[in-house]
Amino acid sequence: MFAVIKTGGKQYKVAENDVIDIEKLEADEGATVEFDSVLALGDTVGLPTIAGAKVTGEVLSQFRGEKVIIFKKHRRQNYRRKNGHRQFLTRVRITGFAGV
């Protein structure tokens, strides 16, 4: 069985025991988190979400992602700007589904 959850402005297709990297959640390592915004659960599709459905997970770690380089340039103007960014992420293991 699988579910589609929405968190951090993105959608993830998950199954039990999957490990996913999502946008940072304010939770400590080992904490249990619940995702209430379930868009699909098995054959059931929500409009836009499924009322009463929840997906639970366990926080494995908090970390920063790979560096993304932003480079801006204007030709013939000697204008060059280089900037780097590392996003804060949370690694979560999906432990179960509840609801429909």
Swiss-Prot record:
Record key words, sorted: Ribonucleoprotein, Ribosomal protein, RNA-binding, rRNA-binding
The reply to whether Magnesium figures as a keyword in the UniProt entry is no
Give the matching InterPro entries: bL21-like, bL21-like_sf, Ribosomal_bL21
Give me any GO biological process, just one.
translation
UniProt-recorded Gene Ontology molecular function terms: rRNA binding; structural constituent of ribosome
Q: What does this protein do?
A: This protein binds to 23S rRNA in the presence of protein L20.
The family annotation for this protein states: Belongs to the bacterial ribosomal protein bL21 family.
Subunit record text = Part of the 50S ribosomal subunit. Contacts protein L20.
| Name this polypeptide is given | Large ribosomal subunit protein bL21
Q: Which organism is it from?
A: Rhodospirillum rubrum (strain ATCC 11170 / ATH 1.1.1 / DSM 467 / LMG 4362 / NCIMB 8255 / S1)
Species lineage: Bacteria, Pseudomonadati, Pseudomonadota, Alphaproteobacteria, Rhodospirillales
